[in-house]
């Protein structure tokens, strides 16, 4: 299997052109290639496929083999993958995902993609569509307790579920201990990604994320979009802000007119290779 390892702010996946080569059993392949000791090492596997409704289709799998709806960091890399490999000559393309069709605008320098702006669509705020078991609409400051820990969560879906709460010092927070308790909480029928956020100023927030099925990652694009949404709903930031993640910064904007979330950030190729599977 030919592959390319890429990352968006350290959120790394193995990217495979599944148009020119047939890939069977991607769930097991993802578990194998993701292993950082016995495989290639990644947060998961991304397949680029043909689409009947968009320029390309992406399917993505977490390191535990489960399929995910969407990943903001991964979709930026898909844009770079197809452009840099001359699978398209367009700087604006559409990608079919399990969370709908996304539009990518790519910034090109010296024939290569350096930045990708993604129209992530409208955030989903209805409890049953996120999904979260709550009577609130939107779900702002839903008090949830797991073991001895209690937080007020604001819940948003960007095609995948996110629960966001605000704390004083995100760097010192014991995420590995507390994140998984809320990921699998009964309030979330399909589990959830969990974001812990520190407010820096009206234009900047800092976050760490416990990703559903992957644990802590260096960055989560949909998580950054959900955090911006929650922060606007709570009046903490304006409609455009910098979201600081462990792997770097993303610029997120909640457009006032079309109500869509736009995410801008880098995409990086690490190396290419072949592996027997």
UniProtKB/Swiss-Prot annotation:
* Keyword match Electron transport: no
Give the pathway annotation.
Amino-acid biosynthesis; L-lysine biosynthesis via DAP pathway; DL-2,6-diaminopimelate from LL-2,6-diaminopimelate: step 1/1
Q: Where is the active site?
A: 71 (proton donor), 220 (proton acceptor)
PROSITE patterns with a match to the protein in the record: DAP_EPIMERASE
Could you tell me the EC number(s) of this protein? Answer: 5.1.1.7
**UniProt-listed InterPro entries:** DAP_epimerase_AS, DAP_epimerase_DapF
Site label Could be important to modulate the pK values of the two catalytic cysteine residues, positions? 162, 211
- Asked if the Swiss-Prot or TrEMBL record annotates the protein with the keyword Iron-sulfur, the reply is no
Keyword list (alphabetical) reads: Amino-acid biosynthesis, Cytoplasm, Isomerase, Lysine biosynthesis
Q: Which domain of life is it from?
A: Archaea
Instruction: Give the record's GO biological process terms.
Output: lysine biosynthetic process via diaminopimelate
Tell me where the signal peptide lies: none
Catalytic activity, per the record?
(2S,6S)-2,6-diaminopimelate = meso-2,6-diaminopimelate
Give the GO cellular component terms, alphabetically. Answer: cytosol
Quaternary structure annotation from Swiss-Prot or TrEMBL = Homodimer.
**Membership in a protein family:** Belongs to the diaminopimelate epimerase family.
Q: What does this protein do?
A: Catalyzes the stereoinversion of LL-2,6-diaminopimelate (L,L-DAP) to meso-diaminopimelate (meso-DAP), a precursor of L-lysine.
Protein's name in the database? Diaminopimelate epimerase
């Amino acid at each position: 299997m030919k592959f390319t390892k890429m990352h968006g702010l350290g959120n790394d996946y193995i990217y495979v052109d599944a148009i020119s080569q047939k890939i069977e059993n991607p769930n097991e392949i993802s578990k194998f290639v993701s292993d950082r000791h016995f495989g290639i090492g990644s947060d998961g596997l991304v397949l680029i496929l043909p689409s009947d409704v968009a320029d390309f289709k992406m399917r993505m799998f977490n390191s535990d083999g489960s399929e995910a709806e969407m990943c903001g960091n991964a979709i930026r890399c898909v844009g770079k993958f197809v452009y840099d490999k001359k699978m398209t000559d367009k700087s604006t393309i559409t990608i079919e995902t399990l969370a709908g069709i996304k539009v990518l605008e790519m910034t090109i320098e010296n024939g290569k993609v350096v930045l990708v702006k993604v129209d992530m669509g409208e955030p989903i705020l209805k409890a049953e569509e996120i999904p979260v078991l709550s009577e609130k609409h939107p779900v702002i400051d839903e008090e949830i307790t797991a073991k001895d820990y209690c937080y007020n969560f604001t819940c948003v879906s960007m095609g995948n579920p996110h629960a966001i709460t605000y704390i004083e010092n995100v760097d010192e927070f014991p995420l590995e201990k507390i994140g998984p308790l809320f990921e699998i909480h009964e309030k979330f029928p399909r589990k959830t990604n969990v974001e812990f956020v520190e407010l820096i100023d009206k234009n900047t927030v800092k976050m760490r994320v416990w990703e559903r099925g992957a644990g802590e990652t260096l960055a989560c694009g949909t998580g950054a979009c959900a955090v911006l949404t929650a922060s606007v709903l709570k009046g903490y930031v304006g409609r455009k802000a910098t979201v600081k993640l462990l792997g770097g910064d993303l610029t997120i904007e909640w457009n006032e007119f079309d109500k869509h979330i736009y995410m801008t950030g880098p995409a990086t190729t690490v190396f290419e290779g072949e592996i027997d599977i």
